[in-house]
């Protein structure tokens, strides 16, 4: 029976590389073949990096055969979002207003970290223009579709990564998230993602969304996201917010028993309307945690809907994209993005600073709240 890699995890692939039952060349070739077959159905990729991926896979195979992998992701096919600089590959931000010929001569920190760990970039994934919304379509690449039902969206803004993860077109996928752009696609495509705490993962160039924007992993399993995050969460001198983090060992398996753990649970944060089927699934997860011995306290965190504060910061960030565009270029933008960017021009400095203060106060409130709980 022929080997199939449509559900293979990065964790299992690395184990098979080590034991010699799988070669990076075989895995990368299979991945590229399936991208060629499946991408026309979902439009998850902005570009394919086939020639370089095959060359790097051959080099990785030789290292594994010699028993000397270059890093914790050696030979693993990965994708990078179109908002993230990737040396040698176009970064167009989903926009016809960006340069068609680069130059793309430098890696963003996470692109460099992944490559230094041995990961092989097989392509870049789609985003709405400048990552502005929770569905994925843009004037440059068109509509990205959900693999579960191509009449539906995979969400956004990391919709290409979500669709690629669902189809395992690459085993690890990079996303970014300011207002749900990892969390929404993962929920729409049945995949797993993390918006890490700001300051764990370096980001450069700086996002127009300032500290709202975080970079993180999107995968098919929690363990693969932990593996990817352990590589992404390394310092880089270009991001002064990231010093030398000494975070948790994300790869250590959780304890078999949660006896003694205190877990805070809010079904709706005190203000959100939750779909009944989703609420039921979450209740099942809570029951499972209780069965493992945890004490679950049902409590709302004690803050009101922060949407107004978020929108002030979001609109002000969006308007920065207009500063370098002439009238003709602005006319070519996604009309929805142009609308919120122009609304951002009406945000006063006082309103912006007030929103920053409100966010800081909420951060402090939640930090104190979490001090009382393990989870």
Predicted region positions:
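Acyltransferase
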Residues: 24-29, 58, 249, 253, ...
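Immediate post-signal peptide segment of exported/extracytoplasmic ligand-binding proteins
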Residues: 60-77, 224, 254-264
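Short glycine/serine-rich loop segments
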Residues: 104-236
């Amino acid at each position: 029976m022929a080997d199939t890699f449509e559900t293979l995890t990065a964790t299992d692939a690395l184990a098979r590389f080590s034991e010699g039952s799988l070669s990076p060349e075989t895995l990368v070739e299979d991945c590229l073949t399936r991208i060629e077959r499946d991408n026309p159905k979902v439009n998850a990729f902005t570009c394919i990096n086939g020639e370089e991926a095959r060359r790097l896979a051959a080099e990785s195979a030789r290292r594994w055969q010699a028993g000397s992998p270059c890093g914790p992701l050696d030979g693993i096919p990965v994708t990078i979002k179109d908002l993230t600089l990737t040396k040698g590959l176009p970064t167009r931000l989903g926009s016809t207003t960006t340069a068609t010929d680069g130059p793309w001569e430098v890696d963003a920190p996470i692109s460099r970290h992944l490559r230094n760990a041995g990961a092989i970039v097989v392509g870049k994934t789609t985003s709405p223009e400048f990552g502005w919304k929770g569905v994925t379509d843009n004037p440059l690449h068109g509509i990205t579709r959900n693999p579960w039902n191509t009449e539906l969206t995979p969400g956004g803004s990391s919709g290409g990564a979500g669709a690629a993860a669902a189809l395992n077109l690459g085993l690890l996928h990079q996303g970014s998230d300011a207002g749900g752009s990892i969390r929404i696609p993962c929920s729409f495509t049945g995949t797993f993602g993390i918006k890490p705490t700001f300051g764990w993962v370096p980001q450069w160039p700086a996002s127009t969304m300032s500290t709202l924007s975080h970079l993180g992993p999107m995968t098919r399993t929690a363990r693969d996201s932990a593996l990817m995050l352990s590589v992404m969460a390394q310092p880089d001198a270009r991001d002064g917010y990231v010093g030398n983090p000494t975070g948790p060992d994300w790869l250590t398996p959780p304890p078999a028993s949660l006896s003694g753990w205190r877990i805070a649970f809010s079904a709706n944060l005190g203000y959100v309307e939750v779909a009944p089927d989703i609420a039921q699934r979450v209740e099942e997860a809570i029951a499972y945690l209780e069965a493992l011995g945890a004490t679950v306290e049902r409590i709302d965190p004690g803050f009101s809907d922060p949407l107004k504060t978020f929108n002030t910061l979001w609109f002000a960030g969006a308007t920065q994209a207009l500063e370098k565009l002439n009238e003709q270029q602005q006319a070519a933008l996604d009309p929805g993005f142009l609308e919120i960017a122009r609304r951002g021009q009406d945000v006063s400095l006082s309103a912006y600073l007030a929103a920053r203060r409100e966010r800081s106060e909420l951060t402090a409130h939640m930090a104190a709240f979490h001090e009382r709980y393990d989870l």
